[in-house]
Amino acid sequence: MKTLILLIQFFTRIPLPIQINMDEINLKKGSALLPLVGVVIGAWNWLVFSLVALVMPLPVAIIAGLFAEIIITGGFHVDALADTADGLFSSRKKERMLEIMKDSRVGANGVIAICFYFLFYGALFLSVPNIQQIGWLFFVLPIVAKGVTMLLFAKMSYAGSKEGLGSIFLGVPWWPIMIAQGIVLIVLALFFSYIGLIAYAGVLVFTIIYRLFVYKRIGGMNGDTLGAGGQMGQLVCLFCLVLIWGLM
């Protein structure tokens, strides 16, 4: 329970007034619970979307659901997406890319990435067959994001500062990663049957390609690329689901 509370405090802005000594917690092994943080975020997103959908048009409810995640996470990983875009697409050397990612200012690539991310997200949500499935997706996608993050932990080389937040998860064993994947697959199967599993196969392909690209550019992961990977992974999952539904 302490591990889950610490993970919620780490990845969300939920004000849990509980002091936990990190020396007592093995976050590397406890990272198996990371998808449960996605459950908390997803439940909040679903609740906000569902309540707004009762009184407002669907596009407004979708925007509210997307904004709900920013509220509960503090835009933690959206900021990571912007920093990653600024750094990796700066056409600079590795050291300079890492410096750009540390810069608190958002550059042109970061702004473009965020704009297209949310535009694409909204367009895909509007392409989902029915409103019930949209609600399910608001719940499930943050869980998928945490599953992708866990995959990126596998045999991770760390390119950032050893004091960086992502370095906490350097050396995560295989078994927490596999447990996390099992949780994600069960959730997808429960809500979307075999279609969800096929969509996650697409997410796995994306994760491999993304990992190879990042390692080629900066030689490993850092906190920004880990966060961005999760955000893009859930978008890829949504894209795959919409694509499969469109082909059926």
Swiss-Prot record:
Q: Which cofactor does it need?
A: Mg(2+)
Gene Ontology molecular-function annotations: adenosylcobinamide-GDP ribazoletransferase activity; cobalamin 5'-phosphate synthase activity
Concerning HAMAP family, the annotation shows: CobS (MF_00719)
- Hydrolase keyword on record: no
Pathway field of the UniProt record reads: Cofactor biosynthesis; adenosylcobalamin biosynthesis; adenosylcobalamin from cob(II)yrinate a,c-diamide: step 7/7
Reaction equation(s) it catalyzes: alpha-ribazole + adenosylcob(III)inamide-GDP = adenosylcob(III)alamin + GMP + H(+); alpha-ribazole 5'-phosphate + adenosylcob(III)inamide-GDP = adenosylcob(III)alamin 5'-phosphate + GMP + H(+)
Q: Please list every transmembrane segment annotated in the UniProt record, as residue ranges.
A: 24-44, 47-67, 70-90, 106-126, 134-154, 159-179, 193-215, 228-248
Keyword vocabulary terms for this entry: Cell membrane, Cobalamin biosynthesis, Magnesium, Membrane, Transferase, Transmembrane, Transmembrane helix
How does this protein lie in the membrane? Multi-pass membrane protein
Q: What is its EC number?
A: 2.7.8.26
Q: Which gene is annotated as encoding this protein in its UniProt record?
A: cobS
Q: Where in the cell is it found?
A: Cell membrane
Role according to the record: Joins adenosylcobinamide-GDP and alpha-ribazole to generate adenosylcobalamin (Ado-cobalamin). Also synthesizes adenosylcobalamin 5'-phosphate from adenosylcobinamide-GDP and alpha-ribazole 5'-phosphate.
Q: Which domain of life is it from?
A: Bacteria
**Origin organism of this chain?**
Listeria innocua serovar 6a (strain ATCC BAA-680 / CLIP 11262)
Transmembrane found in the keyword field = yes
Q: Which family does it belong to?
A: Belongs to the CobS family.
Q: Name one GO cellular component term.
A: plasma membrane
- Biological processes annotated in GO: cobalamin biosynthetic process
Q: What is this protein called?
A: Adenosylcobinamide-GDP ribazoletransferase
